[in-house]
């Protein structure tokens, strides 16, 4: 639990709140003025395969839900890169509240333009919950950077990730199922071969709306399809796997 004393020490702005991530006491500071994390980020964190010896870079970390959850699950070092200065500040404070500041290196930068300073070939893994919507799909709100390809498209993301990870390193990302072919093409052009896919369905009777993707740098072709991840049953209740990923019934 977080004490009232910590909350009053300028750790929260008037428009911010602390959300419980339901895992090992981890919390996250979020703002009503910025994009808040959703289901996709939590599902992606559960899809990542990493160990405490890995050094992971979180590309476009936002408020840091992926960075915090992945560290909590693997105890690895995470470099979180986010272009939004306010979001970086929240992640710094979230890391402080969680007592994990020494394991999270938070960088305020555009990872697309700063691969040299971030360290080419430095990381064993990269994770990314990228913007899904093209900027030509309609009006863009002031939260556009998190959901629209205003700052980064899948091709530039793939190139940056490939530059930053080692040969044999892995990239984990989620992407809309209807754009899967585009993602595979972009990754292949960046020498990232898709090795594992997991379709995500909202219910058993609906087609996948999302794909969780694992790609490996310099690998040979060959994809393993995991079973569909079903969010809810036909009665609208979370499935056992969703409950496990969200730690609804306790830590696992």
What are these regions (language model features)?
Residues 27, 77, 103-105, 193-196:
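Conserved beta-strand segments of alpha/beta enzyme cores
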């Amino acid at each position: 639990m977080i004490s009232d004393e910590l909350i009053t020490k300028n750790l929260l702005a008037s428009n911010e709140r602390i959300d419980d991530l339901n895992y090992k006491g981890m919390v996250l500071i979020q703002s009503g003025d910025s994009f808040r994390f959703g289901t996709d980020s939590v599902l992606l964190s559960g899809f990542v395969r990493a160990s405490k010896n890995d050094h992971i870079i979180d590309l476009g970390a936002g408020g840091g839900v992926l960075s915090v959850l992945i560290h909590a699950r693997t105890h690895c070092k995470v470099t979180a890169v986010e272009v939004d200065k306010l979001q970086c500040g929240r992640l710094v404070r979230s890391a402080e509240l969680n007592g994990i500041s020494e394991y999270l290196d938070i960088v305020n930068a555009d990872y697309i333009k700063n691969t040299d300073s971030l360290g080419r070939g430095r990381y064993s893994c990269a994770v990314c919950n990228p913007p899904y919507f093209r900027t030509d799909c309609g009006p863009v709100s002031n939260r556009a950077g998190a959901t629209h390809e205003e700052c980064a498209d899948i091709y530039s993301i793939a190139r940056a990730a490939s530059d930053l990870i080692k040969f044999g390193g892995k990239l984990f990302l989620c992407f809309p199922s209807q754009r899967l072919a585009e993602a595979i093409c972009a990754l292949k052009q960046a020498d990232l071969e898709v090795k594992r896919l997991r379709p995500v369905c909202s219910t058993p009777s609906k087609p996948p709306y999302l794909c969780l993707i694992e790609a490996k740098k310099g690998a040979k072709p060959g994809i393993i399809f995991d079973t569909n991840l079903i969010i809810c049953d036909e009665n609208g209740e979370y499935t056992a796997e969703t409950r496990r990923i969200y730690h609804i019934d306790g830590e696992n």
